[in-house]
Design a protein with these regions (language model features):
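Short glycine/acidic-enriched loop and turn motifs that connect beta-strands
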Residues: 63-67, 130-135, 195-198, 248-251, ...
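Residue-level detector of Asp-centered blade-edge/turn motifs that repeat once per structural unit
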Residues: 50-53, 119-120, 184-185, 237-238, ...
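Short loop/turn segments immediately following beta-strands, especially the blade-tip
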Residues: 72-84, 143-153, 201-212, 255-265, ...
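Residue-level marker for isolated small/hydroxyl-bearing positions within beta-strands
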Residues: 60, 127-129, 192, 245, ...
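Sec-dependent N-terminal signal peptides
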Residues: 12-22
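Surface-exposed loop and turn segments in beta-propeller and other repeat-based domains
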Residues: 34-41, 85-107, 155-172, 214-226, ...
């Protein structure tokens, strides 16, 4: 009994220590571990996510400049990207095509970005900034996975066009939707883009389902002073902090929310963490392993021999 009590106390102390670190202003919370180059697998890495147990990793891939694919990796050691092996064994392009009837004349999704899964792995959501229908056409694609966490079994269920109209801006519409996050219970979705530098929230009548009952629920103020080229967003576990990063610089910014998971209460001030020059061309990021690890994707877009193309960077917290 005493040993069990000691273990429980250690877990409590670890959690308290971790949240104390993230609440501080120091930039030393993120320790670089390693980089994995996936240029042989993808010419255009974007979003990244993991299965909760760390045994699978997923990235979105832009092939032939725009066409969208999802590439899945198996990890022999959870959350250790050096052990990641691509699951796809065919030719090029690698990965599972992201396609959906109704996306204009071509049903193949284009310009993919962030990836978010339903917690049980039976649904996956991907943002796109492809204007396939106009006015403005940026959207979140919803896919069902007939086998949980197996991206080769995905089937499109819905293209949810994001309402990004802003009458106070000229031009009035967001031109790129890149970021994506959900409230843990699936009743609220958050998206952000490039042109307006704002984050929008939507209430979902059915958790993790965009097919009906989606209601706009508020919008943040403009974040252009610090986050004017967002690539992804992620909340801390209790929804009182929001992390934002993009490819305008090498920083990650942390904002507070006075009401959990309510983007309209996002603070105007923020804390900055510098991730180093390796993230100069950030394309996406994800916290994983109970918020003890951070993974960042980057691509300089040159497709040359510089070594800066299509990389995944691992950090410990």
């Amino acid at each position: 009994k005493s040993s069990i009590l000691v273990l429980k106390m250690k877990k409590v102390l670890f959690v308290l220590f971790f949240f104390t670190l993230l609440s501080s202003n120091s930039s030393a919370e993120f320790t670089f571990v390693q980089t994995k180059n996936v240029a042989l697998d993808t010419p255009g890495i974007r979003g990244i996510n993991f299965k909760p147990d760390g045994t699978r990793m997923y990235i979105t891939n832009r092939y032939d400049d725009q066409k969208a694919y999802m590439i899945e990796y198996s990890l022999s050691k959870p959350f250790d990207i050096s052990t990641a092996t691509i699951s796809f064994t065919g030719g090029k392009p690698k990965g599972t095509a992201l396609a959906c009837d109704g996306a204009g004349g071509d049903d193949h999704m284009e310009l993919p970005h962030a990836i978010e899964f339903k917690p049980d792995g039976t649904r996956v959501f991907v943002t796109t900034n492809k204007d396939f229908s106009g006015n403005p056409g940026v959207a979140v694609f919803q896919f069902r996975l007939s086998t949980p966490w197996d991206s080769t079994t995905l089937v499109c269920e819905k293209i949810y066009e994001v309402d990004v109209t802003d009458s106070g801006k000229n031009p009035p519409d967001e031109d790129q939707v890149r970021t994506l996050a959900f409230k843990p219970d699936g009743t609220r979705m958050f998206v952000g883009g490039k042109a307006e530098h704002k984050i929008r929230q939507y209430d979902l009548a059915t958790p993790f389902d965009l097919r009906s009952g989606v209601t706009p629920g508020g919008i943040s103020g403009a974040l252009s002073s610090a986050d004017n080229n967002m690539r992804n967003i992620q909340f801390n576990p209790d929804g009182t902090q929001l992390f934002i990063a993009g490819n305008q610089n090498t920083r990650m910014n942390k904002y507070n929310l006075s009401t959990a998971y309510d983007i309209t209460t996002l603070s105007s001030s923020f804390t900055t963490f510098d991730l180093g020059s390796r993230t100069n061309n950030m394309m996406g990021f994800i916290f994983a392993s109970n918020f003890t690890k951070l993974f960042v994707t980057s691509d300089d877009g040159n497709n040359d021999d510089s070594g800066n193309d299509n990389q995944i960077h691992e950090y410990e917290i």
